[in-house]
């Protein structure tokens, strides 16, 4: 039972990270002028919706209740600060997905979590690219 509780906690924490991106996406997107960065942020937003759905389904399948919680919006729109924080969130999400995949016994769920983890690796690269573009004066 303790293991199941740990898995549900990790999945709900990951859900909060994904849901925060979904909720904050319009605010962040409106602040971006560069079309390349806008497109990359759009990818993050769309995939976050898919991840949140998968996580909510996994939580429910394990007998838990998805906690639809999210972080409050940033007080100021400092894109560099926002994406530095997003980079840390992507890294945490990767860890949570990998940890959850390691703990679950259900092969289908394990495969889904491993797939999300692989996508998080790509998100980390994408956010790093966004930060590089912001450092170059684009935003």
Regions found by a protein language model. Name each.
Residues 1-139:
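Iron-associated oxidoreductase/ferritin-like identity signal
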